[in-house]
From Swiss-Prot:
<dbReference type="InterPro" id="IPR051306">
    <property type="entry name" value="Homeobox_regulator"/>
</dbReference>
<protein>
    <recommendedName>
        <fullName>Homeobox protein Mix.1</fullName>
    </recommendedName>
</protein>
<keyword id="KW-0217">Developmental protein</keyword>
<feature type="region of interest" description="Disordered">
    <location>
        <begin position="334"/>
        <end position="369"/>
    </location>
</feature>
<dbReference type="GO" id="GO:0000978">
    <property type="term" value="F:RNA polymerase II cis-regulatory region sequence-specific DNA binding"/>
</dbReference>
<comment type="function">
    <text>Transcription factor which plays a regulatory role in the development of the embryo. Involved in the establishment of dorsal/ventral pattern in the early mesoderm. Activates the head organizer gene cer1 by acting synergistically with otx2 and siamois through the 5'-TAATCT-3' element of the cer1 promoter. Also binds as a complex with lhx1/lim1 and siamois to the 3x 5'-TAAT-3' element of the cer1 promoter.</text>
</comment>
<feature type="region of interest" description="Disordered">
    <location>
        <begin position="41"/>
        <end position="93"/>
    </location>
</feature>
<dbReference type="GO" id="GO:0005634">
    <property type="term" value="C:nucleus"/>
</dbReference>
<feature type="DNA-binding region" description="Homeobox">
    <location>
        <begin position="96"/>
        <end position="155"/>
    </location>
</feature>
<dbReference type="InterPro" id="IPR001356">
    <property type="entry name" value="HD"/>
</dbReference>
<comment type="similarity">
    <text>Belongs to the paired homeobox family.</text>
</comment>
<keyword id="KW-0371">Homeobox</keyword>
<dbReference type="GO" id="GO:0045893">
    <property type="term" value="P:positive regulation of DNA-templated transcription"/>
</dbReference>
<dbReference type="GO" id="GO:0000981">
    <property type="term" value="F:DNA-binding transcription factor activity, RNA polymerase II-specific"/>
</dbReference>
<dbReference type="GO" id="GO:0006357">
    <property type="term" value="P:regulation of transcription by RNA polymerase II"/>
</dbReference>
<dbReference type="GO" id="GO:0061629">
    <property type="term" value="F:RNA polymerase II-specific DNA-binding transcription factor binding"/>
</dbReference>
<feature type="compositionally biased region" description="Basic and acidic residues">
    <location>
        <begin position="70"/>
        <end position="82"/>
    </location>
</feature>
Amino acid sequence: MDGFSQQLEDLYPSCFSPCPSPLGFSEPVIQPFAMNLAPAAQKDFQQHPNRREVTKIPGAGEQSPVQNVRPKDAINPKEADPRSPTADASLVPASQRRKRTFFTQAQLDILEQFFQTNMYPDIHHREELARHIYIPESRIQVWFQNRRAKVRRQGAKATKPILAGHHYSGTSGANRAMFPSAPAPNSSSHQMTTSRAQVQPLKESQMNMFHQNQGFLPYPDSSCNVSRQRFLMSQPTPGAYHLPQASSNVYNQNVKSQNPLWNQQTTNRVYTNMMETVLDLSRRPSQQMPVQPMLMNSFQTNKNIKPEVYTTSPQIPVSTTSSQVSLFANQEPCHMSTTQGGTYGQISPISDSGVSDTSPEPSSDWEENVASVLLNL
């Protein structure tokens, strides 16, 4: 420490007195040291004084700085309340509420007269009215806005009773239509609805009868619907077999049965005659069946026939003189020959199982019915 103070003394001889202090620093050393500090350091040095000064206990005659501070509750409310009459005028805020504008009857008449001609005046018209009746232009604009809103409210109230009247009238009309004693509003539509309701059961009953009678027709007992359709399509026309006139109209009756106004009794009578004819033909004794090439060729088979199993059919001359003459008029019966045994084996058009089979199937009831019908005709 002594060496350091000696160096300072050599560097700054003017700042040290000839009698050094016990700490090794003279009194003037503090002044240039404090002056060489930065401004922030000087401020901190000034704000933080010595502890001895802070912990100084006040005397009896001195007052503590804490006692000089008054609490908030001790402040006079008259000094803090700006609404007090004794408060300063600069502290009282200005009122933001706009004063109400009162119109005289003459001013209202002029505004109402102008409103009848123009409901939406522009800025020029409003300024002209303001100069004429001595009212600010902004007040005139507000008056026109309120007047238009009043017109809209009046229009809405005027339309509500009319709509309510239409609603009640429509409801009463619907109630009158529900009761049979009151006349219907549209008699033609009511009659059409009644007629449709009466025709619908008749149409359904005729359709049911048609399907029931259709089920009695002789078609093969097969689980496949395609074979039934092919059998019905392969049937020749009634004129080729000289059937009675009643049976020739069966196809027309089937078409006419779709008409709901067709007589049900006539349809039942035609079907009854047809069924009697078919049953009578099926009861006759069986004869040798002639071969018809067209009938045999109409059936398409999906089975492969072995080479040793085949049938032969001779060619039959067809008469072209008249379409009404039977195809079997001048033809002699022909016997079918087979290479194996004497049993005639016919392959069904479509297999029930759906798998191709090369073995022929035995004759069925369907083949016997076809043979009996063709022989008797």
